């Protein structure tokens, strides 16, 4: 659609360029912007245009346009608002969704912008009405009715007993007290939501200074607050049953009418099945669904055609006196899920949403046509950051393999070695802010049998139930594991075949060859991951077609071992392959192969050369989260989206689903029935199959089941979270009533969940340091922890409440920035930071690290040091004092003999930096062992250094 700037109203220029709301009021048939201080204040005699701009994860902006029509506005004014929304959409590039909002019948999405409610005022611009500030006039007693259990519709009703009924919630706003009257047939959720309106009235009309009372329908005068409430109505009297309201707008939900707007007229289209192919890109259409009227506008239609189609929709509703029908206008390629769902089938087409890269390219093309230099503008976008795990990885891990309807505990040495034909259960315990947290998961191999999968889910669910539902439960499929899984296991391998009796029986009965991995056989492994704390080796078919230029590989046949590095790999990938080689073939010499210079023997083992891909294997990206409330009438899942959600939307009586595309979270409230709790994983499975957002969800998408009060950080990060709220007692209504009456948030002894700051991972973590804190006894749980050196150092750099999250502890390259290095002439023999470090080893256990005992100077030095931390650093340097009578190396470190520094030493040295064992060798012994000086060694690539250290048992 080509649009001339002369067709656009000047008021819309520059609109939608930043996230947030923008509102215009129609005055004399022109859009006039209103100040942000007046957002949410609507007058019944006016029409408004509301633009909501949302920044998406992909860097683009999404626009939703609403035009709100007051009940007293003129038809001409409402028609102007409808046409101007089309014009505003054109100014934004023609991809916004447009909604018609009628006073009293607004959409949930619209009301979510103005939480907790909107309360339209009488009057408007055309009537010359002047709004009088609340505090400038005598308070008038008013009665409001509230409906809705997710968003609240508020309507003022006559202040009379006849307005009350048993089905709704009523708010009586008097000069000194606000009463909430709860109809006996109203739900807990409706009562809780109405309390948000009470709080709003208290803050807005009473400056937060008035009493609040709750009155239950049916309570007599014996209740003091009930008696006071009924006194305003002349005394208590039973309420009559509300007569059913005759709704003149009844629709046949199963019959949709499709109308084509052609040359100014609406022409009905006859069809047997409502198919996408009926819509032509050069036409506008109306799809009349009764309660909703969609206007679909083809990409090649003109602005005038779109305006005319919009006018036709308004006239259609006006002629039929359909005041409650919602009008939704969509552009081809940007249809809503609700519109697509009306069709029998909707083709899977790539999203036309404009990403930041697309936008940069279009702008560059425009500037280039104008003769400007666009070289800098067209630089490649920065590489995507590795996703964060948002989980503490210093916990303890146990793993079981499913075998014959039972689970077998794996020894620590085998906990990270899975087989694609088997199923596993894992339990991970890790420190939380106020308690130990637990994650229980089941993992299904691609070739595992259904019986083992059912057993795994059943046994894992029993473990969660025995933990009183306080553990998070997850269901994972091979190849679709989330980042949390990988950082928990750190080093993870998947082998071909399986060990379970069920798998062995299945392949025998079906005549399938047993290709279970053999250490001395032929095997090819794809190596992947982001570093030593997140690396995987996946066995693939031993064929050249399994190679990929973006990965490194390990190929072995007996004692013959090759490593292969693709041309698109990084030095970090090469680091990871060396570490995995130490696990898969720890005592074998390997031959390195670079892509393009392979030996004949290498190709021979793979059965000869063949074509192979070069792009990395794609994983589902995390998208903008969507929250849904869930009910299960007669086993059928019914869901409803909650827009612009907050923590307060999670009600303790209900089940909610948070859909992030890459992961599905099922949140279960404390007040939910136990039978429904046990169905939580099934609810998640049904949601994935339903694919409500039509985002082509994979059936293997990870599902997490989370109980209220046990929310992990990787869930709470989607909210502004206050853990005290989820630890309150009572139902949703009782909790909110205590907050409203108390005038603030609940005061509990439990600490609030800290919102952590996540830094990047260290690229190097010494294997021996990690293994030192692991138990290799089958009876014991595998436990990871910080090294003593790091724990002591971290005591000076971290607050008492901080903890390690998602990665092993960050490491420090230098204690001072270059510009702040202490002068050598004035530097003490022991730096303040080091003095604090060594002092922390001697502190009694009753004194916490980071306490008041630290000197102000030490705190300043620590702050200086922490500023030099980076997310990608390679070594931890701790300069401790040279002990008496010990030789000192050139670097100021004590010198120890080689036999005491190796990882298998009978009498190992303690209190050294285990990531740099080689630095404690004397210069002479270092040259003897490594065949080069320390300086020459320091210039080698890191992966090569590590390879040499492994060979000398110093790694």
Swiss-Prot record:
Keywords: Actin capping, Actin-binding, Calcium, Cytoplasm, Cytoskeleton, Repeat
Gene Ontology biological-process annotations: actin filament capping; actin filament organization; actin filament severing
Chain spans, region Disordered: 741-783, 801-895
One term of GO molecular function: actin filament binding
Compositionally biased residues, Basic and acidic residues: 842-864
Extent of Polar residues compositional bias: 756-776, 867-878
Major localization class: cytoplasm
Membership in a protein family: Belongs to the villin/gelsolin family.
Protein name stated in the entry: Villin-5
């Amino acid at each position: 659609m080509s649009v001339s700037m002369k067709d656009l109203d000047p008021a819309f220029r520059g609109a939608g360029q930043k996230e947030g709301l923008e509102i215009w009021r129609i005055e004399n048939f022109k859009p006039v912007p209103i100040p942000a201080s007046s957002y949410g204040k609507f007058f019944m005699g006016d029409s408004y245009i509301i633009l909501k701009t949302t920044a998406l994860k992909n860097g683009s902006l999404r626009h939703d346009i609403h035009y709100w029509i007051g009940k007293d506005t003129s038809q001409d004014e409402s028609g102007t608002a409808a046409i101007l929304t089309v014009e505003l959409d054109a100014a934004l590039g023609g991809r916004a969704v447009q909604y018609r909002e009628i006073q009293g019948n607004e959409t949930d999405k619209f009301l979510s912008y103005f939480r907790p409610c909107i309360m339209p005022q009488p009057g408007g611009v055309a009537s010359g009405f002047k709004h009088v500030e609340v505090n400038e006039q005598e308070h008038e007693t008013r009665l409001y009715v509230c409906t809705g259990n997710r968003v609240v519709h508020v309507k003022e009703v006559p202040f009379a007993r006849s307005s009350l009924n048993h089905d709704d919630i009523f708010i009586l706003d008097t000069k000194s007290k606000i009463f909430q009257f709860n109809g006996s047939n109203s739900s807990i959720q409706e009562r809780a939501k109405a309390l948000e309106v009470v709080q709003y009235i208290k803050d807005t009309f009473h400056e937060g200074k008035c009493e609040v009372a709750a009155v239950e329908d049916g309570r007599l005068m014996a209740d003091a607050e009930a008696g006071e409430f009924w006194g305003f109505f002349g005394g208590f009297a039973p309420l009559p049953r509300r007569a059913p309201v005759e709704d003149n707008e009844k629709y046949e939900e199963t019959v949709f009418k499709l109308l084509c707007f052609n040359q100014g007229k609406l022409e009905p289209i006859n069809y047997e099945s409502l198919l996408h192919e009926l819509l032509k890109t050069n036409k506008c259409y109306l799809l009349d669904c009764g309660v909703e009227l969609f206007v679909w506008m083809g990409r090649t239609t003109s602005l005038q055609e779109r305006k005319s189609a919009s006018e036709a929709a308004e006239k259609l509703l006006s002629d039929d006196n359909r005041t409650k029908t919602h009008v939704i206008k969509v552009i081809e390629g940007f249809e809503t899920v609700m519109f697509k769902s009306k069709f029998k089938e909707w083709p899977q087409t790539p999203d036309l949403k404009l990403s930041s890269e697309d936008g940069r390219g279009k702008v560059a093309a425009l500037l280039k046509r104008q003769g400007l230099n666009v070289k800098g503008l067209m630089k490649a976008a920065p590489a995507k950051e590795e996703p964060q795990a948002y989980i503490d990885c210093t916990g303890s891990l146990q793993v079981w393999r499913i075998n014959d309807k039972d689970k077998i505990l794996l020894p620590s040495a085998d906990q990270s070695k899975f087989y694609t034909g088997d199923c596993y259960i894992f339990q991970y315990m890790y420190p939380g802010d106020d308690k130990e947290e637990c994650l229980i998961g089941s993992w299904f191999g691609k070739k595992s049998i259904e019986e083992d999968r059912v057993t795994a889910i059943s046994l894992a669910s029993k473990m969660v139930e025995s933990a009183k539902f306080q553990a998070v439960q997850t269901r994972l499929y091979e190849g679709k594991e989330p980042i949390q899984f990988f950082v928990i296991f750190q080093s993870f391998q998947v082998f071909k075949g399986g060990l379970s009796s069920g798998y062995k029986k299945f392949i025998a009965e079906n005549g399938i060859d047993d290709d279970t991995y053999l250490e001395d056989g032929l095997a090819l492994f794809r190596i992947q991951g982001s570093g030593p704390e997140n690396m995987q080796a996946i066995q693939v078919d031993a064929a050249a077609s399994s190679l990929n230029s973006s990965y490194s590989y390990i190929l072995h046949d007996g004692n013959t071992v090759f490593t292969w590095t693709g041309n698109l790999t990084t030095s970090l990938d090469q680091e990871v392959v060396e570490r995995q080689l130490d696990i898969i073939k720890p005592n074998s010499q390997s031959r390195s192969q670079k892509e393009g210079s392979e030996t004949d023997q290498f190709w021979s083992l793979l059965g000869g050369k063949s074509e192979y891909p070069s792009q990395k294997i794609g994983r589902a990206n995390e998208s903008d989260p969507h929250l849904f409330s869930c009910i299960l009438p007669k086993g059928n899942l019914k869901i409803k989206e909650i827009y612009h959600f907050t923590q307060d939307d999670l009600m303790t009586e209900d089940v909610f689903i948070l859909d992030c595309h890459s992961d599905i979270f099922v949140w279960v409230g404390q007040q939910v029935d136990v039978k429904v709790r046990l169905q939580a994983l099934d609810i998640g499975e049904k949601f994935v199959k339903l694919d409500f957002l039509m985002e082509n969800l994979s059936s293997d998408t990870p599902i997490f089941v989370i109980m209220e009060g046990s929310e992990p950080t990787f869930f709470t990060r989607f909210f502004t979270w206050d853990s005290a709220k989820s630890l309150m007692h009572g139902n949703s209504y009782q909790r909110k009533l205590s907050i409203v009456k108390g005038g603030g948030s609940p005061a509990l002894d439990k600490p609030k969940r800290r919102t952590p700051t996540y830094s990047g991972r260290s690229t190097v973590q010494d294997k021996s340091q990690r293994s030192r804190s692991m138990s290799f006894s089958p009876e014991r749980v595998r436990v990871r922890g910080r090294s003593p050196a790091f724990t002591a150092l971290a005591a000076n750099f971290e607050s008492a409440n901080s903890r390690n999250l998602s990665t092993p502890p960050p490491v420090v390259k230098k204690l001072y920035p270059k510009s702040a290095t202490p002068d050598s002439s004035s530097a003490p023999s022991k730096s303040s930071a080091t003095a604090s470090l060594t002092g922390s080893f001697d502190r009694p256990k009753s004194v916490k690290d980071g306490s008041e005992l630290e000197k102000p100077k030490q705190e300043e030095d620590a702050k200086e040091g922490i500023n030099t931390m980076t997310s990608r650093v390679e070594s931890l340097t701790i300069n401790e004092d040279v002990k008496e009578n010990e030789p000192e190396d050139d670097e100021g470190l004590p010198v120890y003999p080689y036999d005491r520094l190796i990882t298998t030493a009978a009498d190992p040295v303690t209190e050294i930096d285990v990531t740099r064992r080689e630095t404690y060798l004397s210069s002479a012994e270092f040259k003897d062992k490594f065949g080069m000086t320390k300086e020459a060694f320091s210039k080698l690539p890191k992966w090569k250094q590590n390879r040499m250290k492994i060979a000398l048992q110093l790694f």
